[in-house]
């Protein structure tokens, strides 16, 4: 387990905790949101649950180094978990408890994970389900495996879609405006850090095209779509922001 900022791995709290199944999932799926949040002064910690061992291109060592560099570009800290390995992630309560331990340790307000849609890499859908379970387990004070940590209830769980096939059909998205040039530049640089995966720019161009499409839906130049696990609660109408429909 390594981090770009080891102080975040022990007891320091973070604002946002992001889980990804493989190196580059976070960068491609919600890297612009991470960049926007860290540039606004919020702390973000990334948890990568494999080193891309099953991938066609790049060694595990390369993949880990690329993710570490991308996290630095995004302004986030990072750690890697050894679970079942790339393409072997299983639905096991032990994994959910391990994720819950991270949630209790870092006490984030917001947690992001890959969507639970089945028509995508199986690690992605399973990770989304495991993180959802972990968010609940983290707030159960009587969990015998976690009695050494104080329970913690996150405020919101949001999903991101790495590919178009992973977009939930039954959840209305929230759109995060990522149009600021410095955000887009940092996000693009973080994706480009995964050199072993970028023999061409096709995948990066796909993500930029998706951001443009979401932006068109949101009435801005570029946007990232996130999908809330639960209804969002606002203290007043003034907090809701603007709607995507431009009446």
Predicted regions located by residue number:
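Metal-dependent de-N-acetylase/amidase catalytic core
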Residues: 2-17, 91-247
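Active-site rim/loop-helix segments in enzyme catalytic domains that contact anionic ligands
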Residues: 1-106, 227, 239-246
């Amino acid at each position: 387990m390594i981090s770009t900022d080891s102080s975040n791995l022990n007891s320091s709290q973070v604002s946002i905790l992001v889980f990804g199944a493989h190196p580059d999932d976070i960068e491609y799926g919600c890297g612009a949101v991470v960049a926007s949040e860290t540039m606004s002064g919020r702390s973000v910690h990334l948890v990568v649950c494999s080193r891309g061992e099953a991938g066609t291109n790049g060694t595990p060592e390369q993949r880990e180094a690329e993710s570490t560099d991308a996290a630095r570009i995004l302004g986030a800290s990072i750690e890697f978990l050894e679970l079942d390995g790339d393409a072997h992630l299983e639905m096991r309560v032990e994994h959910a408890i391990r994720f819950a331990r991270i949630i209790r340790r870092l006490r984030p307000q917001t947690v992001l994970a890959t969507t639970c849609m089945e028509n995508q890499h199986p690690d992605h859908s399973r990770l989304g389900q495991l993180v959802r379970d972990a968010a609940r387990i983290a707030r159960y004070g009587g969990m015998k495996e976690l009695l050494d940590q104080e329970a913690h209830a996150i405020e919101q769980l949001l999903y991101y879609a790495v590919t178009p096939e992973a977009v939930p059909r039954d959840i209305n998205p929230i759109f995060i405006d990522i149009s600021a040039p410095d955000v887009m530049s940092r996000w693009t640089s973080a994706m480009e850090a995964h050199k072993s995966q970028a023999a061409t720019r096709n995948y990066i161009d796909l993500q930029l095209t998706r951001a443009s499409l979401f932006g068109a839906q949101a009435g801005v130049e570029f946007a990232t779509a996130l999908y809330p696990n639960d209804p969002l609660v606002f203290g007043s109408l003034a907090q809701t922001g603007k709607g995507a429909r431009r009446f």
